Curated annotation (Swiss-Prot):
InterPro entries: CybS, SQR/QFR_C/D. It comes from Saccharomyces cerevisiae (strain ATCC 204508 / S288c). Component of the TIM22 complex, a complex that mediates the import and insertion of multi-pass transmembrane proteins into the mitochondrial inner membrane. The TIM22 complex forms a twin-pore translocase that uses the membrane potential as external driving force. Its role in the complex is unclear but it may be involved in the assembly and stabilization of the TIM22 complex. Coiled coil: none annotated. Keywords: Membrane, Mitochondrion, Mitochondrion inner membrane, Protein transport, Transit peptide, Translocation, Transmembrane, Transmembrane helix, Transport. This is Mitochondrial import inner membrane translocase subunit TIM18. Disruption phenotype: Although cells lacking TIM18 live well and do not display any strong phenotype, they do not survive in the absence of mitochondrial DNA. The chain crosses the membrane at residues 89-109, 114-134, 145-165. Belongs to the CybS family. GO terms for cellular component: mitochondrial inner membrane; mitochondrion; TIM22 mitochondrial import inner membrane insertion complex. It holds the Pfam family CybS. PANTHER family: SUCCINATE DEHYDROGENASE, SUCCINATE DEHYDROGENASE [UBIQUINONE] CYTOCHROME B SMALL SUBUNIT, MITOCHONDRIAL.
Length: 192
């Protein structure tokens, strides 16, 4: 139970967290419209003759309001797939830690699935960043270019995972070798 000085007690803290102004002043009604009183007054003094025409047009606050555009990321399956990839990574990262502590060798199929699901998770995360910060409605060419670059980088990374799994011992073994102090035995893509 939260108490505000001089006001009634608030039983539910979620109202304070969600909207602290309404929690402190429950009877206060705040308007979210911008006030153009001084600007409209100047315009009204300058355009006295156009009073009949302005009633037919929409007011300035209605003209300025634009409903939010539909987002590609909202209500799509991409969020669900990203969540599935995120929760799949939890057990897949625990198994290599267990294998490294016990001295065992990790299965190559498990190593390939760990690295490819990690790549899928990163690709979904970067796709959502592109959708949020380079909107298709505002920057159509840059949005498409960013997505093509992301897909190209993902395909190149998938080829790198294939090379790592077939020519080396895999992603987990590479990380294990990178954490070792002696790097004489480190072999990455044809370099000694």
């Amino acid at each position: 139970m939260l108490l505000f000085p001089g006001l009634k007690p608030v039983l539910n803290a979620s109202t304070v967290i969600v909207n602290p102004v309404r929690a402190v002043f429950p009877g206060l009604v705040l308007s979210t419209k911008r006030s153009f009183y001084s600007i409209n007054r100047l315009n009204a003094e300058n355009k006295i003759n156009d009073i009949a025409n302005t009633s037919k047009e929409a007011s300035s606050s209605v003209q300025m309001f634009k409903p939010p555009e539909f987002s590609q990321f909202k209500d799509s399956y991409q969020k669900d797939y990203e969540r599935i990839a995120k929760y799949t990574l939890i057990p897949l990262t625990m198994v290599p830690f267990y294998a490294s502590f016990t001295g065992g060798v990790i299965n190559p199929l498990l190593d390939a699935s760990l690295s490819s699901i990690f790549l899928i998770y990163l690709q979904y995360g970067f796709t959502s960043c592109i959708i949020d910060y380079i909107p298709k409605e505002k920057y159509p060419r840059w949005h498409k270019l960013a997505l093509y670059c992301l897909y190209g980088g993902s395909m190149l990374s998938l080829y790198g995972i294939y090379e790592l799994e077939t020519k080396n011992n895999g992603f987990v073994d590479l990380v294990k070798k990178l954490w070792n102090e002696n790097d004489d035995h480190l072999y990455i893509f044809g370099r000694n």
